[in-house]
Amino acid sequence: MSFSRRPKVTKSDIVDQISLNIKNNNLKLEKKYIRLVIDAFFEELKSNLCSNNVIEFRSFGTFEVRKRKGRLNARNPQTGEYVKVLDHHVAYFRPGKDLKERVWGIKG
């Protein structure tokens, strides 16, 4: 797997792929409903992360919020000025075993 010039996949691409997958299984669901489900899914992810909940999808991975320590020697890349960064929270994703194996090319 090469990481130079990787193609970007958009939400519309994902909607198209899911729609095709559904059609291949002899089901019918309009793309606008697929988009609604995807939007609702991400809203729930954001809402749960903002509530400091851990979201686990077995074999795929875990989403959580972690606290990142501040530091004194951060540098603004535009001005070169040194600034103080306070402690803050960041969204974090920890991949699950199956995802790691697929990305690394390991047969499971």
From Swiss-Prot:
User: Changing residue 65 to L does what?
Assistant: In strain: 25015
Q: Which GO terms describe its cellular component?
A: cytosol
Q: What result is annotated for mutating residue 19 to A?
A: In strain: A44S and NY13-87
Entry's Gene Ontology BP terms: chromosome condensation
UniProt keywords (A-Z) are:
DNA condensation, DNA-binding
- InterPro entries per the UniProt record, alphabetical: Hist_DNA-bd, Histone-like_DNA-bd_CS, IHF-like_DNA-bd_dom_sf
Recall the GO molecular function terms of this protein's record: DNA binding; structural constituent of chromatin
Cystines in this chain:
none
Q: What role is this protein assigned?
A: Histone-like DNA-binding protein which is capable of wrapping DNA to stabilize it, and thus to prevent its denaturation under extreme environmental conditions.
Family the entry assigns = Belongs to the bacterial histone-like protein family.
Quote the protein name from its UniProt record.
DNA-binding protein HU
